[in-house]
Amino acid sequence: PISRRNFIELCWKLTEEDEAQFEALWRYLGLSVDWSQHYQTIGAKAQKIAQAGFLRNLERGEAYQAQAPGLWDVTFQTAVAQAELEAREYPGAYHSLAFHGEGGDVVIETTRPELLPACVALIAHPDDERYSHLFGTTVTSPIFDVELPVLAHPAAEMDKGAGIAMCCTFGDLTDVVWWRELGLPMRSVLGKDGRIVAQTPEWIASERGVAAYQAMAGKTAFSARKALVEALADSGEMLGEPKPTSRMANFFEKGDKPLEIVTSRQWYIRNGGRDHIEANGRQLRENLIAAGNELAFHPDFMHVRYDNWVGGLNTDWLISRQRFFGVPIPLWYRVRESGEVDYDDVIV
């Protein structure tokens, strides 16, 4: 593996080569440019401005770190911000799985059966009469035999799949909402490398559940799905054959695999995506909308776009990345005598 210093040196070399090519092209095209004003977004001046801005954010309480679920690219091995997403159509298949309740089986449909060991609840819409009698009861998961509550939440879609869904930590952003708002436990089984973690989780105790998990452990999500689907078919807890479908999935703009949601420690800037009360007693999101109302937008429709953008934020701005090349966050962490890094003891 290449060292951080050598990697950055190579990046700078490539940057200089690209700059020369772009300048030659733009001169050839006759663009009117003041060549004394060029800069690099990760140059010394830009870094100084960005780092000073971050320290101001930190001082004002606008920047914070958190161990939280976030979008993760398993290929690039880095966290990804909402602004870097691309929605692309992705092939998949619905798998009908039978959860076992006292009054009979409850069938759900999922495109992510490999996340079954991470399931923490079954969730349906509170107005869905098909499942209202189940709210407050429990079921056990197929093959893993884990007891799970059946809960109600308005984000459940009655017309999607079977109308009742398993909440896993985490398959998509809706799972994050359910986990946070319903106070559900964290049961992570997918690592940052995109593979099922090797150690069997403590919440899986049955003999057949342990065997099924060990058959998945260490595999990629795709291979783990294949192994578990075979096991579910053998146990009779997958009903029928998988039904091909396509879904919109989130991709990193530079990636070729759907993003996963992985829990990691990252730095964030408050932007209204999460609840936060400001000094005037109002939510940050409300203050951002109010500030937009004081501006004159040209053209007018950009005001609507701004309001939609603020209203559509579902998380704060994630600014840290697991990359060598970029603007470093100007912080250090103390190291305990044991050699363990204390991320809560920040040195500015």
What are the residue ranges of the model-derived segments?
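Residue patterns forming the tRNA-binding/recognition surfaces of aminoacyl-tRNA synthetases
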Residues: 1-105, 160-339, 343
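Protease-associated
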Residues: 101-164, 172-177
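Short, intrinsically disordered, charge-balanced linker/junction segments flanking boundaries
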Residues: 344-348
